[in-house]
Amino acid sequence: MKKWMAGLFLAAAVLLCLMVPQQIQGASSYDKVLYFPLSRYPETGSHIRDAIAEGHPDICTIDRDGADKRREESLKGIPTKPGYDRDEWPMAVCEEGGAGADVRYVTPSDNRGAGSWVGNQMSSYPDGTRVLFIVQ
């Protein structure tokens, strides 16, 4: 009788696991998805992709008011380099940005074009919007 009950319990547990939909990790952790065009901005796109792969967040929580302070924090101690911009990920406009951001030297045309593109994409999103970045 005990073996039969244990078998029944095990079968019920397996059946329950198969029938209950599994939660998709991170499914509710963002509000919008932004598909960043790697072919259009290859240096900035590669930087974003690499920084995310190294453990930096792929989510940007928009906070425009704090951008200047976070930019100062993220670029502190990173010298300027003639002919290059310092690109940071997470971006300064993101709550996740600031001290500890990944910084890479990229050409100004790529960096500023990418910044303009992202700004246009997110212009209608209010502060607090959580944007998932996917580089493709």
UniProtKB/Swiss-Prot annotation:
Named cofactor requirement(s): Mn(2+)
EC number: 3.-.-.-
Major location category of this protein: secreted
Enzyme class: hydrolase
GO cellular component: extracellular region
Biased composition (Basic and acidic residues): 63-75
Protein localization: Secreted
Signal peptide: 1-28
Binding note for cofactor: Mn(2+) ion stimulates activity.
Domain of life: Bacteria
Keyword field: Hydrolase, Manganese, Nuclease, Secreted, Signal, Sporulation
Ranges where the record places region Disordered: 63-88
One GO MF term attached to the UniProt entry: nuclease activity
Pfam families associated with the record: DNase_NucA_NucB
One GO term (biological process): sporulation resulting in formation of a cellular spore
Family: To B.subtilis NucA/ComI.
Cited function: Degrades both double-stranded linear and covalently closed circular DNA. Likely to play a scavenging role in order to supply nutrients under starvation conditions.
Protein name, per record: Sporulation-specific extracellular nuclease
The organism of origin for this protein: Bacillus subtilis (strain 168)
Gene that this sequence comes from: nucB
